[in-house]
Curated annotation (Swiss-Prot):
Species assigned in the record: Agrobacterium fabrum (strain C58 / ATCC 33970) (Agrobacterium tumefaciens (strain C58))
Family that this chain belongs to: Belongs to the DNA mismatch repair MutL/HexB family.
Protein name (record): DNA mismatch repair protein MutL
Keywords for this protein: DNA damage, DNA repair
Pfam families given in the database record: DNA_mis_repair, HATPase_c_3, MutL_C
A GO cellular component annotation in the UniProt record: mismatch repair complex
Length: 606
């Protein structure tokens, strides 16, 4: 079969298959064009999940009739001219408009700022009309109808209208976070209007618009730099987490990306602070010389390649961990709101609702909980009636019981976690603060303190090792022995001392004391397998931290142990001085704070 030149329309349709995967892809490309045009107001209207209509209206610089004619031609752009090493705009290929026009019905109406009249051009299935005069406000309107009508096979791969509309919403949210000075409005027949007002230069306020006010209350500021690379943004405290990674936003030179390297760095930064299956919330912006990052490696420009990926990963992990160390003793404010909800009549985490109640009567007075559906009762368990409370008697109590029942001696309440006042169910410490109270899970809190102490010893100095009375000799393939010995110095720094023991054998003379009784054969063989793929030293370090966490769990104050007042206060003071004490090793909160105003609201005093 002879080789022949493809038609321009077919070339554009092939390009559209890479650039325009779904309606949200078209929306992304068009919104990027509006931002590059300097728009401060962008309106997006959709129908049919974007399959029927996507209309982008902006107040940007607009286009002249000559520019409009070139805009629908492939690889015509005003954003680059000679090189890809200095890309400072979101778009640069000149592919989006001709690609969309080849598979849909495209109409562009535009008027330059200061021009008396606008112009319009249409592209239907790759066929371009002449440029015509048109009435138009300053700026540009791009209308895409019947997406993929020219390639109907593509329609079979689209999701439901609801799913496609949700994908468009996510695109708009990402753009809105990156550009807080722009007002976005998203509307259409298949959605309620989403209006995102401009917040100027206040990035945190824009994040609160998108992620909710709770994020603002639980965010830690990130501001770090290394070798002309800066990292700014906000990261949530570990206990403020979500069930998926959709609340992680990363921007490179203002460009929203979903790069695996960057998302992996965020996960690494929160290692051992977020529960398994939960994901931290973060909004990070990386700024660097455009020459040091390649944004042209993915058709949709969602992935990037850094000249020094190790530098970027290290910066993200280090900056977040430093911020968590600085403010990591904070617990998420959502705990207090959940506690408040638990005290409300009829509350249940499973969503059970109380039965309709009549007007006030003795049967529904505060001395008796409101009736609710199922077995759930007020505050999850039925509260005792006031009439059931045992009245005081003149019977003498043993002195030991009397002393144990007394509240701890008064302590200053000006500490961040206050002064211990009581212990509930031999597991929870109640502390009074200057403006409320704190409830501490004693086991989770002490578990974190022990773990941090062990981890500090691990990273600040060589962990203690235990000398084996008889060295363990392990037979391995020669290549495994070579790889292990290449990393012997790194192992030694972690307390594992190995030596050559002739051909195809390794002698283990010392093991980390933290590991206790360890299967030396299994450990070394596992390291030999892993070292071919990862850095074995870091693998061992992670193993040591995991073991340290396990040991801390077993060595901490157990639930069910009665603590003396001075022990409770000592635990509170240690928590205040320990980074990351706001959550245990498994990512659960160690304490919940309830403000006095919240308590007063429970009793209707506010």
């Amino acid at each position: 079969m002879a080789i022949k030149q493809l038609s321009e329309t077919l070339i554009n349709q092939i390009a559209a298959g890479e650039v325009i995967e779904r309606p949200s892809s078209a929306t992304k490309e068009l919104v990027e064009n509006a931002i590059d045009a300097g728009a401060t107001r962008i309106e997006i209207a959709t129908a049919g999940g974007g399959k029927g209509l996507v209309r982008i209206t902006d107040n940007g610089s607009g286009m002249s009739p000559a520019d409009l004619e070139l805009a629908v031609r492939r690889h015509c752009t005003s954003k680059i001219s000679t090189t890809l090493d200095d890309i400072r705009t979101l778009g640069f290929r000149g592919e989006a408009l001709p690609s969309i026009g080849s598979v849909a019905k495209l109409t562009i109406t535009s008027r330059q700022q200061g021009a008396e009249q606008g112009s319009v051009i249409s592209v239907t299935g790759g066929k371009v009309s002449d440029v015509r005069p048109a009435a138009s406000n300053a700026g540009t309107i791009v209308e895409v109808r019947d997406l993929f009508f020219a390639t109907p096979a593509r329609l079979k791969f689209l999701k439901t209208e609801r799913a496609e509309a949700a994908a468009i919403t996510e695109v708009v949210k990402r753009m809105a976070i990156a550009f807080p000075h722009i007002r976005f409005v998203l509307s259409g027949t298949d959605r309620s209007t989403l209006e995102i007002p401009s917040t100027g230069d206040d990035h945190l306020a824009r994040m609160a618009q998108i992620l909710g006010a709770e994020f603002k209350d639980n965010a830690i500021e990130i501001d770090a730099g290394r070798e002309d690379v800066t990292l700014t943004g906000f990261a949530g405290v570990p206990t403020f987490n979500r069930g998926n990674s959709s609340h992680q936003y990363v921007f490179v030179n203002g460009r929203p990306v979903q790069d695996k390297l960057l998302l992996s760095a965020i996960r690494g930064a929160y290692a051992e602070t977020v529960p398994h299956g939960r994901y931290p919330v973060a909004v990070l912006s990386i700024t660097l010389d455009p020459a040091f990052v390649d944004v042209n490696v993915h058709p949709a420009k969602s992935d990037v390649r850094f000249r020094d990926p190790g530098l970027i990963r290290g910066l993200i992990v280090g900056a977040i961990r430093q911020a968590l160390t600085r403010d990591g003793d904070r617990a998420a404010t959502t705990g207090a709101s959940q506690m408040m909800n638990a005290f409300r009549p009829g509350y249940s985490p499973s969503g059970l609702r109380p039965s309709p109640s009549a007007t006030w009567s003795a049967a529904t007075s505060p001395s008796r909980p409101l009736a609710v559906s199922g077995d759930m009762q007020f505050a999850e368990a039925a509260q005792s009636r006031f009439s059931d409370i045992t009245m005081p008697t003149a019977r003498a109590e043993p002195r030991e019981a009397y002393e144990a029942s007394q509240s701890p001696s008064p302590e200053p309440v000006l500490y961040p976690l206050g002064a211990a006042r009581a212990q509930l169910h031999e597991n929870y410490i109640i502390a009074q603060t200057e403006n409320g109270l704190v409830i501490v899970d004693q086991h989770a809190a002490h578990e974190r303190l022990v773990f941090e102490e062990m981890r500090n010893a691990l990273h600040s100095r060589r962990p203690p090792s235990q000398v084996l009375l008889i060295p363990e000799i392990i037979d391995l393939p020669e290549e495994d022995c070579d790889r292990l010995m290449d990393h012997a110095a790194g192992f030694d720094a972690l307390g594992l001392v190995i030596e050559r023991f002739g051909p195809g054998a390794i002698a283990v003379r010392e093991t980390p004391a933290m590991l206790g009784e360890v299967n030396v054969q299994g450990l070394v063989r596992q390291l030999a397998d892993e070292i071919a793929e990862w850095d074995a030293a870091s693998t061992l370090a992670n193993k040591l931290e995991y073991v340290a966490a396990t040991m801390a769990c077993h060595g901490s104050v157990r639930s069910g142990r009665r603590m003396r007042p001075e022990e409770m206060n000592a635990l509170l003071r240690q928590m205040e001085n320990t980074p990351g004490s706001g959550q245990c090793n498994h990512g659960r909160p160690t304490y919940i704070e309830l403000k006095l105003s919240d308590i007063e609201r429970l009793f209707g005093r506010s």
